[in-house]
């Protein structure tokens, strides 16, 4: 009976250890995913800033030429 208790205790102990290791790995993966999401959001904001700067430079060159043409057609 004592050997059965020891075996059962060993199985339970190893089960708890493996569960705790799995939980740690899952937490680490979740943290890594959150970091990647943060990096992706930063990259997205950089892309948006790049897009707005391109649109701004296009607007600087196009608007002064388009406004007089529109004014001629309307007036």
UniProtKB/Swiss-Prot annotation:
- Specify whether Nuclease is a keyword of the entry: no
Q: Which GO terms describe its cellular component?
A: extracellular region; membrane; other organism cell membrane
Q: Which residues carry this modification: Leucine amide?
A: 74
Query: Signal peptide position in this chain?
Result: 1-22
Question: Which keywords accompany this UniProt record?
Answer: Amidation, Amphibian defense peptide, Antibiotic, Antimicrobial, Cleavage on pair of basic residues, Immunity, Innate immunity, Membrane, Secreted, Signal, Target cell membrane, Target membrane
Task: State the InterPro entries in the record.
Answer: Caerin_1, Frog_antimicrobial_propeptide, FSAP
Annotated S-S bridges:
none
Instruction: Spell out the residue ranges making up region: Disordered.
Output: 24-48
Alphabetical GO biological process terms: defense response to bacterium; innate immune response
Q: Which family does it belong to?
A: Belongs to the frog skin active peptide (FSAP) family. Caerin subfamily.
* Name the UniProt record assigns to this protein: Caerin 1.11
């Amino acid at each position: 009976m004592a050997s059965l208790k020891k075996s059962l205790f060993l199985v339970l102990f190893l089960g708890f250890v493996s569960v705790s290791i799995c939980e740690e790995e899952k937490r680490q993966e979740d943290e890594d995913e959150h970091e990647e999401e943060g990096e992706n959001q930063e990259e997205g904001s950089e892309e948006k800033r790049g897009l707005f700067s391109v649109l701004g430079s296009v607007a600087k060159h196009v608007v002064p030429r388009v406004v007089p043409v529109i004014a001629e057609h309307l007036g």
